[in-house]
Amino acid sequence: MAQFDIYPNPGQGKIDVPFLVVIQNNHVATHTGTSIVIPLRTNSISLETICPPVEVPGAGQFVLSLIEIFAIANIRLRNRVGTLSFADRGKIKPAIDKVIGEY
């Protein structure tokens, strides 16, 4: 499993959050058995920096819900559906900085 890979949500909230994107680098994930993921939401309002829109290949646009970031066991992430584009990857760090940065 690679950083920025997109997986179907294995949890119960699949209607509102059909996908999860892995943001943790590969090195850490192989040592911990978990990955840090950000939910990709449907029916959510995009908040410019904190919750930007991203494209899931073959599935359309979703909202990167950074405020719901969490860790999940790697064994629960199966059947990768794609990878975030370089443009969409570039939206993650500014979103994290906006949430945890000093202002």
Where are these regions (language model features)?
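Generic secretory/membrane-interface signal
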Residues: 2-3, 52, 62, 91
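Compact nucleic-acid interaction/catalytic patches
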Residues: 3-6, 10, 14-53
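C-terminal terminal-subdomain/extension
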Residues: 57-103
